[in-house]
Amino acid sequence: MEEAVREVVSQLGRRGEADLALVFASTAYASDLPRLLPLLRRELSSRHWLGAAGGGVVGTRADGTAAEIEQAPSLSVTLLNLPGAAINSVALSTTSLPDLDGSAQTWQEWSGLNPQHCRSQILLIDPTSSNINDLISGMDYAFPGAEKIGGIACPHNAPHGSLLFDDRVVTGAVICSIGGDWRLDSVVAQGCRPIGPVFAIEQVQRNVVLELSDGERRDTPVACLQRILADLSEEERDQVRHSLFLGIERRNLQLTPNRLDAAGGAFLVRTLIGVDPNNGAVAVADRVRPGMNVQFQLREADASRNEALNLLRASTENPGSAPVFGLLMACL
């Protein structure tokens, strides 16, 4: 780890105090995570520090080329100078959350974040945390106008958490609130392409989808998928065996126009975590309810790359809000 820290510090160079430092380390350094921030803070200065362990790390090499490194020791550090920004960072326990039926003010007070100084949030969550969906729903409820980016950190076998905050390793969640003269605009490249029609959920138990409909036709998710498979190529059917996901409609995502359904919705890709061959049901890694639209998705690198490029080009077309920097959060 010391060598990785020296290399990162050498690339960043000596500079004044940054406003925000984002640190991401591969799980190859899991056992050394408690030493990481103290090592970095001896050489680099920032008002706020947060980050996470990841299965893959994205960053820029010494020669200026971007790289994504997976399943190998890697470290990425980003220092941001944001003059005029109102920044606040907090570490929160997720074991006891406010009631989702309570007031937005209760959630705001629990988080310790001021909604008047919160235009954007970076939200990182430990994979061992409880109530993850409730936490995200609560933050959306309490800060409806704040763009949120982030993800769930990667699990590991070391006896501590996966999140980095100030000079320590924590569990639960860490949140960086950004306001004032700065905001983060989120775009989502799904890494997948849709297959088959858009279905409506007819029956569901918690996160287990029991029945879907396509117009007047109703059937189990497995039966719907079998009909889709009949129209796929042999190569696509092979992809389904290891790269199948479910897209769940979200109407507040910024995606490219070709990723919108006929009603203008967008689909947030979620992992399928189980199939019941007895009743044809599927379990999905998200909370779903009857009436939601869903669509099966195949993971595809080219589709993700093209979509990301289109989104980034579109983000530069508004002359009144030209982007100054970009943050890439790669996770499902």
Question: Where are the predicted features?
Answer:
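Small-residue-enriched flexible segments
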Residues: 1-20, 25-34, 39-41, 47, ...
